[in-house]
């Protein structure tokens, strides 16, 4: 379109130089005339509006002015003819034609560049549309992915809230269980401490009872040794009786007294064995039960005291009988010298008891019984102290 307009605009190139010059001059003059006509017409419009009856005068003025313009036009045409004859003007016209030709070439180049620009612009717009489509698609995918992630996060949030509620409830239950466990642990520790103390007391009591039992066993052994010595003495007395008929009466009394003493000693030994068995039973009960009530302690103490009192009375009676027996045996010393020798032999066989330091008599001594009774009393006393 631009090239067609250019061709139309510059179609006067085919005209001759003079004709073109005249046309240019006419165009210039016509333009000037038109401008003047327009100015004059603008100036005339107001008077016509003011007075419609004065138009002949104005018409005559216009005719006059038209004539003047024609004269001016002729002057310009003459000036144009003079210019065509001027070599400098012709050179300028040739240069003008070259410039117009180059302008046409440039215009063609501009059209090609414009076409390329439009093609590039179309490609750019296509790429932009494609990029926009891809961007919209990517945005939709990201939006969808974001919504899915949001839904997933919301589900996880709800799950975490439920888990937190469950965890809080479980933690509260565990706290209660832990508190109960701690309380039970404290009770068990207190009970364990109590049992430990009771065990220490029981061990101490058992050790004391063991020592008492050992002392009782030692006393029993000593009593059995005394009994064996008495049995040997009795046998020796029987032999002495066969040897000395002269001292038969005295020996008979001594033998009878010895038999009575032996029976008493055997009875006392049996009673001491029963006491020892009772002490062993008591020790066993203490080991199994580990504790006695106050009532049982009182009963046991009263029983032991009663038995000790009875045993002491019995031992006192035996001591009196032994004293009487010794007194009765003194006058018969001259009649039976062999019996005296036998008694002196018995005296030489006397031993010292390691527990009390007393001299062992041929009969049951008070020291042995006292040891057994003291062992029972000591065991009871230690248990009460514990």
Swiss-Prot record:
Biased composition (Polar residues): 339-359
Region IgA-binding: start-end pairs: 42-152
Xref: InterPro entries: LPXTG_anchor, M_anchor, M_repeat, SMCR, SMDRR, YSIRK_signal_dom
Protein name: IgA receptor
Motif (LPXTG sorting signal): 353-357
Cellular component aspect of the GO annotation: extracellular region
Pentaglycyl murein peptidoglycan amidated threonine, modified sites: 356
Described function: Binds IgA of both subclasses, and also binds polyclonal IgG weakly.
Region entry Disordered, spans: 79-221, 233-268, 323-360
Start-end of each D repeat: 302-307, 308-313, 316-321, 323-328
Family, similarity comment: Belongs to the M protein family.
Biased composition (Basic and acidic residues): 79-88, 97-128, 134-166, 174-201, 209-221, 233-243, 251-267
Keyword line: Cell wall, Peptidoglycan-anchor, Receptor, Repeat, Secreted, Signal
Gene: arp4
């Amino acid at each position: 379109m631009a090239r067609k307009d250019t061709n139309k605009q510059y179609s006067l190139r085919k005209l001759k130089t003079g004709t073109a010059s005249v046309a240019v001059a006419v165009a210039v003059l016509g333009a000037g005339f038109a401008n003047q006509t327009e100015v004059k017409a603008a100036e005339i419009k107001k008077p016509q509006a003011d007075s419609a009856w004065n138009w002949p005068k104005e018409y005559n003025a216009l005719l006059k002015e038209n004539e003047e313009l024609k004269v001016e036009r002729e002057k310009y045409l003459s000036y144009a003819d003079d210019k065509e004859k001027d070599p400098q003007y012709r050179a300028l016209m040739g240069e003008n034609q070259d410039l117009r030709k180059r302008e046409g070439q440039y215009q063609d180049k501009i059209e090609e560049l414009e076409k390329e620009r439009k093609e590039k612009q179309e490609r750019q717009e296509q790429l932009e549309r494609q990029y926009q489509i891809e961007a919209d698609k990517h945005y939709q995918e990201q939006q969808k992915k974001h919504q899915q992630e949001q839904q997933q996060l919301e589900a996880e949030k709800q799950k975490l809230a439920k888990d937190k509620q469950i965890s809080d409830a479980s933690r509260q239950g565990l706290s209660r269980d832990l508190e109960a466990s701690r309380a039970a642990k404290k009770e068990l520790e207190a009970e364990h401490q109590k049992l430990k103390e009771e065990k220490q007391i029981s061990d101490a009591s058992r050790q004391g009872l063991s020592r008492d039992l050992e002392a009782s066993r030692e006393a029993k052994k000593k009593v059995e040794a005394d009994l064996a010595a008495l049995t040997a003495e009795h046998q020796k007395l029987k032999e002495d009786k066969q040897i000395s008929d002269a001292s038969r009466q005295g020996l008979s009394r001594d033998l009878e007294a010895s038999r009575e003493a032996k029976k008493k000693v055997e009875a006392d030994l049996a009673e001491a064995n029963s006491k020892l068995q009772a002490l062993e039973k008591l020790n066993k009960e203490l080991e199994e039960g580990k504790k006695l009530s106050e009532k049982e302690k009182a009963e046991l103490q009263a029983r032991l005291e009663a038995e000790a009192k009875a045993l002491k009375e019995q031992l006192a009676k035996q001591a009196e009988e032994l004293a009487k027996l010794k007194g009765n045996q003194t006058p018969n010393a001259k009649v039976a010298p062999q019996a005296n020798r036998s008694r002196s032999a018995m005296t030489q066989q006397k031993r010292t008891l390691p527990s009390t330091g007393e001299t062992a008599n041929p009969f049951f001594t008070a020291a042995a019984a006292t040891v057994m009774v003291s062992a029972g009393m000591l065991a009871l006393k230690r248990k009460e102290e514990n």
